[in-house]
Amino acid sequence: MQEMKPVKEGKVREIYDNGDSLIMVATDRISCFDVILNNEVTKKGTVLTQMSKFWFDMTQDILPNHMISVDVKDMPEFFQQDKFDGNSMMCRKLDMIPVECIVRGYITGSGWASYQKNGTVCGITLPEGLKESDKLPEPIYTPSTKAEIGDHDENISFEQSVTHLEKYYPGHGQEYAEKIRDYTIALYKKCAEYALSKGIIIADTKFECGLDENGNIVIGDEMLTPDSSRFWPADGYEPGHGQPSFDKQFARDWLKANPDNDWTLPQEIVDKTIDKYLQAYEMLTGEKLK
């Protein structure tokens, strides 16, 4: 069996070059505040991969995606080890567009902080009188630039995203900025409506898009996972304050409350975190994680 080494390691994912495709492995690492924690969260990588597959399958009518297979039998022999089973995805190679596509359907997090200051989020003026966690009249698109590991992503306005993309794709900045905005809002709307029918509010989420060899826009990376999205239980939803969520919030809250944490979580917080991930997966897909 030929040993393979990742060509790129992100905070959570490892990417392997498989010639005309990539193998994307979601590890059990967890990152908060752009820092990789010392803990691993068992099964987290499998939740991320299988949930992305679920949404990719559901949304091909809106936008094609980069997924080829999540079956390790379709991958080189190196990936036919237990540690890769379930958390690995074979993908098409894309030229990734250097903008994170954030769609917000509810006002929370950094969006709420910005609104409190001046009534806007990423240059978009919102109605007066919104409360924390309120549903927005329409989902808004608030792009950000993609940071290297250790840096923070920077929120930008739509106009700034046009200028930013024009540098990479001369003559196509406006076109690509508009397309990724319109596609990702459409993806969010379809998936948020479905999720609500299963008892989950998708408050906001981050998509990443790329160009295939023919210059078509394709959805890449992960899609609508607890790592890239805020999932709230619809049961008990009440604007006016923060909401409980099916994601890393347990971990974030504990780290904030314990500033001397040296980036290590107690096991109880790790267990609560994976419970939330599994609960979201089961509610959305109607299946238990294999």
Language-model-derived ranges and their functions:
Residues 21, 96-98, 198-202, 214-217:
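Coil-to-beta-strand transition motifs
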Residues 103, 202-223:
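Conserved metal-phosphate-binding beta-hairpin within the catalytic cores
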Residues 46, 50, 175, 179-182, ...:
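Generic recognition of stable, solvent-exposed alpha-helical segments in well-folded globular domains
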Residues 33, 112-113, 214, 228-230:
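Intrinsically disordered, low-complexity acidic/polar segments
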Residues 1-148, 261-290:
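Active-site loop/lid in soluble adenylation, ligation, and acyl-transfer enzymes
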